[in-house]
Amino acid sequence: MPACRSRPRCGHAGALTMQRYVLVDASARPDTPQALRYYLQDLPHRSLFARQPEAEHADLGPWLVQLPEFGQAPIEGWLRALEQGHPAVAWLASAGDFDAVFDHLETCLDLRRPNGTLALLRYWDGRVFVRLQRILTANQRLQLLGPIARWRTRVLGEDVVVSLSATDGQEHCDA
């Protein structure tokens, strides 16, 4: 597991206003990048590959999107349909602002291999995220979450939720 550059947690999840985010794998279907461009016009968004060596593939990488605090954005119906057939959407809640969440997720992209080379860790893919929950230590899972209080993804028709308890500061996983 990469040592994601740890950021301080934003306090207890229940004490602060949670912002809603989604992490979308734009490579899920051939039409996903075009659909994202259509739906993202009025929402804060950025590809996690934008400042990476993979920048030339930013349109096909994972995108962080901030959803409105209240109400539903048109993109949400499309995302729910996308996640029915592809493990391509992660619904996140964080007290952190867009830049804090983006910066944290960006720092978790690289995995240092034993030989010193870097590999891309596809944690935004729901299938990979579920496997990571099984193999990472509790501390590593908390590092991956960073400022994220709740992470929900759908794999094989089942919701997987990892959340930080506001009362005990501990991480919980419901699959």
Give a label for each model feature.
Residues 2-122, 126-175:
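Terminal low-complexity "docking" segments
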